[in-house]
């Protein structure tokens, strides 16, 4: 378990985890990925709190700094995956052509727009969260729910897209029970994030459900999942949860 968690940090963050202490990327590492989300969410929440202290309550700049820390801590690979996935979904042609577009490395119009929307929505939503522990919990929930969505994308029965090295190592590795346990845990964690006790859990479930539909569409379009699809699942879910938690 320790090796899997270390592997999850090595895979999902810039932390210099010693190679000898990590498990090989696969089922165990992916199962531990939401644990990385908890830590990243706590760091982002601390930055949001510090920014709110420095710039005033509900400062958009504080929200932007929290998002920036997440981007730095993850090497921006998830937001890059969102951009590539949106570009792939936005092109015409066979799955092979869509995959070539995704592997091109440059962001198209759709991909660039998706980055702006995701970063902007997360920034504003984080800044609108209530102060104190409720707001901190909200950030942790949003970031962790994104990693639970990655497990949904790797659940049993989901294939890897042709030629995807990362997809081939993690696709279909997560049993439904693992996904449900993590989903229930994050939904329970979301209870104190809002004044209405049902709003947080409902937001998490709806967001993860929406991402499951996105993953299904990606499987139809690309023939399976790729590392970019995992990044898209993480960013979409994080964004939807953050926005859902600030609905009045």
Curated annotation (Swiss-Prot):
Joins adenosylcobinamide-GDP and alpha-ribazole to generate adenosylcobalamin (Ado-cobalamin). Also synthesizes adenosylcobalamin 5'-phosphate from adenosylcobinamide-GDP and alpha-ribazole 5'-phosphate. Pathway: Cofactor biosynthesis; adenosylcobalamin biosynthesis; adenosylcobalamin from cob(II)yrinate a,c-diamide: step 7/7. Its cofactor is Mg(2+). It is found in: Cell membrane. GO terms for molecular function: adenosylcobinamide-GDP ribazoletransferase activity; cobalamin 5'-phosphate synthase activity. This is Adenosylcobinamide-GDP ribazoletransferase. It catalyses: alpha-ribazole + adenosylcob(III)inamide-GDP = adenosylcob(III)alamin + GMP + H(+); alpha-ribazole 5'-phosphate + adenosylcob(III)inamide-GDP = adenosylcob(III)alamin 5'-phosphate + GMP + H(+). The keyword Magnesium applies. GO terms for cellular component: plasma membrane. Its EC number is 2.7.8.26. Belongs to the CobS family. It comes from Mycobacterium sp. (strain KMS). The chain crosses the membrane at residues 1-21, 35-55, 59-79, 101-121, 123-143, 171-191, 197-217, 227-247. NCBIfam families: PRK00235.2-1. Keywords: Cell membrane, Cobalamin biosynthesis, Magnesium, Membrane, Transferase, Transmembrane, Transmembrane helix. It is a multi-pass membrane protein. GO terms for biological process: cobalamin biosynthetic process.
């Amino acid at each position: 378990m320790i090796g899997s968690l270390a592997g999850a940090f090595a895979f999902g963050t810039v932390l210099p985890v010693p190679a000898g202490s990590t498990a090989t990327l696969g089922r165990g590492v992916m199962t531990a990925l939401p644990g990385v989300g908890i830590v990243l969410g706590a760091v982002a929440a601390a930055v949001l709190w510090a920014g709110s202290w420095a710039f005033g309550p509900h400062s958009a700049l504080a929200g932007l700094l929290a998002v920036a820390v997440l981007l730095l801590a993850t090497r921006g690979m998830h937001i890059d995956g969102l951009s590539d996935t949106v570009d792939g979904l936005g092109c015409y042609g066979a799955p092979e052509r869509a995959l070539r577009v995704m592997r091109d490395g440059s962001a198209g119009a759709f991909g660039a727009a998706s980055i702006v929307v995701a970063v902007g929505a997360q920034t504003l939503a984080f800044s609108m969260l209530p102060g104190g522990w409720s707001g901190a919990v909200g950030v942790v929930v949003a970031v962790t729910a994104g990693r639970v969505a990655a497990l949904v994308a790797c659940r049993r029965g989901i294939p890897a897209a042709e030629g995807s090295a990362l997809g081939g190592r993690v696709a279909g590795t997560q049993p439904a029970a693992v996904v449900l346990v993590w989903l229930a845990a994050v939904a329970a964690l979301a209870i104190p994030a809002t004044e209405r006790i049902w709003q947080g859990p409902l937001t998490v479930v709806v967001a993860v459900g929406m991402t499951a539909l996105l993953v299904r569409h990606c499987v139809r379009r690309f023939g399976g999942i790729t590392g970019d699809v995992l990044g898209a699942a993480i960013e979409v879910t994080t964004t939807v949860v953050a926005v859902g938690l600030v609905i009045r």
